[in-house]
Design a protein with these regions (language model features):
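A compositional/biophysical signature of low hydrophobicity enriched in polar/charged and small residues
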Residues: 1-79
């Protein structure tokens, strides 16, 4: 299983609509609206890199999505 964060830049005014579309995408474990450089951070859980590519492709086709940056989680430490 591969876990990754997909960091998303949105056009203003499209966040709520985009979230509704993202909720339809398989492999997304969490969607967070954040302040700062990015507007939305999504956590994806996929079987392989090909599936991750398909997931990011689906996100990139959503209206208002300007740019995505994907960060694959190499190691996670539970506190």
């Amino acid at each position: 299983m591969i876990n990754a964060y997909i960091l998303i830049n949105m056009q203003p005014g499209n966040v709520d609509k985009a979230i509704k579309e993202m909720q339809k995408i398989e492999n997304l474990a969490k969607i967070s609206v954040v302040a700062g450089e990015f507007d939305i951070v999504v956590r994806a859980q996929v079987k392989n890199l090909e599936e991750l590519l398909g997931t990011t492709d689906k996100i990139q086709t959503i209206d208002g999505v300007m740019k995505t940056t994907t960060q694959i989680i190499e190691k996670e430490i539970a506190l």
